[in-house]
Design a protein with these regions (language model features):
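Short, Lys/Arg-enriched N-terminal segments with co-localized hydrophobic residues
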Residues: 1-4
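Conserved N-terminal alpha-helix of the aminotransferase class I/II PLP-enzyme fold
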Residues: 18-63, 85-86, 90-91, 96-98
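Glycine-rich loop at the start of a catalytic domain that most often binds anionic cofactors/ligands
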Residues: 51, 70-78, 96
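Conserved core of the PLP fold type I
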Residues: 55-75, 108-109
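Conserved PLP-anchoring active-site segment centered on the Schiff-base-forming lysine
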Residues: 73-91
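Hydrophobic beta-strand scaffold residues
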Residues: 81, 104-105, 164, 171-172
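PLP-dependent aminotransferase-class I/II
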Residues: 102-159, 166
Length: 172
């Protein structure tokens, strides 16, 4: 059966719950998460915070919202975000970087959505040049969109992390 089953990864919005999922939703304990009264959201946020050794976590209902909040937290208006030219934050988030954070974007040509650590030092703007945006954040993703499901190797992440540290860049 599974050999012939197609799995649609185009978007998280194309999925449909099976009857057991619908039943679980009907029986779930509910509350207002804004007031800290939703036990399911509270449990999820506590579990994720513990997993990552953080004081707290915030549940976001979409990847786009999560990305835009992270970018806003890491940047100031006028800063620059460095990312691959195929990245979701550039291609599919409605200009959110400019609209929500007031930042410009520097696009790098990577390999199926993956940039290399060596590209970062050449992408960073001169911090003493008042005519250029302040390079502040590098954004990475394991893309299932235009990169066709390509994933970074952990060693690549580590090398990019070091390049970001070397150039005082935040990493998302």
């Amino acid at each position: 059966y599974l050999r012939h089953m197609a799995i649609d990864f185009r978007s998280d919005t194309v999925t449909r719950p099976v009857p057991a999922m619908l039943q679980a939703m009907m029986q779930a304990k509910l509350g207002d998460d804004v007031f800290g009264e939703d036990p399911t959201v509270n449990f999820l946020e506590e579990k994720i915070a513990d997993m990552f050794g953080m004081e707290a976590a915030v549940f976001c209902p979409s990847g786009t919202m999560t990305n835009q909040i992270a970018i806003k937290c890491h940047t100031q208006p006028g800063d620059e975000v460095i990312c691959d030219e195929l990245s979701h934050i550039y291609q599919y988030e409605g200009g959110g970087i400019a609209f929500n954070s007031g930042c410009s974007v520097k696009l790098l040509k990577g390999d199926l959505g993956r940039i290399a650590a060596a590209q970062i030092k050449y992408a960073v703007n001169n911090r003493n040049d008042a005519h250029r945006a302040y390079s502040k954040l590098v954004s990475l993703e394991n893309t299932s969109n235009r990169g066709g499901g390509s994933c970074y190797h952990f060693k690549s992440f580590a090398a990019i992390r070091k390049a970001c540290d070397d150039h005082e860049l935040k990493l998302h």
